């Protein structure tokens, strides 16, 4: 059984330069899992913080399960990330460096469990964003030219 991506944080790739990625488990309730299976998540403003030796995902939004009842989950709540101690210490050291932050990049299913891909990122300046857009357009034009040449 492979990896199936549920929700991607496209905003993170635009605003940040991803230096390193890490996969983490996440503590969720039953209705949150069902909502994610229905692609009801958003990672737009989410970030990761470390407190008391535990990693937490903040400001992530998982839509309420539409068939849920009164026991439905809160949409924006603190969610605990499941990482080894050495990974948490490594992230804490990265967060303490100036200019670096840890943001979630995607939710995905792996062997039936929901995982979060988190990335250690550095913010892009406006000229860096323009440069990456120009680079992306060049690659797109090159791919289109290659496709036409094979016809």
Curated annotation (Swiss-Prot):
The keyword Cytoplasm belongs to this UniProt entry's keyword annotation:
yes
Offer an example of a GO molecular function term for this protein. Answer: RNA binding
What biological-process GO terms show up in the record?
Answer: trans-translation
CDD domains in alphabetical order: SmpB
Pfam (any one): SmpB
Location of the protein in the cell: Cytoplasm
Family, according to the entry, reads as follows:
Belongs to the SmpB family.
Name of the featured protein? SsrA-binding protein
**Native source species:** Chlamydia trachomatis serovar A (strain ATCC VR-571B / DSM 19440 / HAR-13)
Q: Which gene encodes it?
A: smpB
């Amino acid at each position: 059984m492979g990896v199936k991506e549920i929700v991607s944080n496209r905003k993170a790739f635009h605003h940040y330069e991803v230096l390193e990625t890490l996969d983490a488990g996440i503590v969720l309730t039953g209705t949150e899992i069902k909502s994610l299976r229905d692609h009801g998540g958003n990672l737009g403003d989410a970030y990761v913080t470390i407190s008391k030796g535990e990693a937490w995902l903040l400001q992530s939004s998982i839509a309420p399960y539409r068939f849920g009842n009164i026991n439905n989950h809160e949409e924006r709540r603190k969610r605990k990330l499941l990482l080894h101690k050495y990974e948490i210490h490594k992230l804490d050291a990265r967060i303490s460096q100036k200019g670096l932050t840890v943001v979630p990049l995607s939710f995905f299913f792996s062997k039936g469990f929901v995982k979060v891909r988190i990335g250690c990122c550095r913010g892009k300046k406006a000229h860096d964003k323009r440069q990456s857009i120009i680079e992306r357009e060049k690659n797109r034009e090159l791919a289109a030219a290659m496709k036409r040449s094979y016809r």
